[in-house]
Design a protein with these regions (language model features):
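N-terminal low-complexity, intrinsically disordered patches enriched in charged
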Residues: 11, 48, 135-137
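Short, Lys/Arg-enriched N-terminal segments with co-localized hydrophobic residues
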Residues: 4-15
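N-terminal helical capping/dimerization or prosegment-like subdomains
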Residues: 13-97, 102-106
Length: 151
């Protein structure tokens, strides 16, 4: 068994998709961890430059930067949200939604600190890993896969 990321288990196999995942899994986990290390608990502010607080702005910038590093076109919409676009050869559009804010960490973290993600027994654990930073990153990597395959 390989590493479990947000309910998906990457295994070595013959399929091209599994080979691609196996090749990029460490990078994907690194990027999920990078985003999950940001304590992006949403707070309301009067500052229009960071309407949900500095940490949420940092998470937005980190997500957009990751999209840009993958060759996509990121857009920041007045620090409220962002979009990461890729214009392929087709007129077909695919969209996915995610968020990078988290609820407060709370108590009871026994295996790690909430904003210091770790892999334990093949499972990535940390605040926001499954809701929703890991899911967002998994979708972004799926889009990267499609782009690299020439779709």
């Amino acid at each position: 068994m390989g590493l479990q990321v947000d309910g998906f288990i990457a295994r070595k196999g013959k399929a091209m998709e599994n080979e691609w995942i196996e090749k990029h899994i460490d990078e994907m986990v690194r990027d999920i961890c990078k985003l999950s290390e940001i304590p992006s608990v949403s707070v309301k502010t009067e500052n229009p430059d960071m309407p949900f607080g500095q940490a949420c702005l940092d998470a937005l910038h980190a997500a957009l930067d990751l999209g840009k590093s993958m060759g996509f076109e990121p857009f920041n919409h007045e620090n409220y949200c962002g979009t990461i676009l890729w214009k392929g050869e087709s007129d077909t559009e695919i969209g996915f939604f995610g968020h990078a804010d988290v609820v407060p960490a709370g108590n009871g973290w026994t295996c790690c600190q909430p904003f210091e993600p770790v892999v334990k027994d093949g499972i990535l654990i940390g605040r926001g890993v499954s809701d929703n930073k890991g899911s967002f990153m998994t979708a972004l990597y799926a889009l990267r896969y499609l782009k690299e395959q020439g779709y």
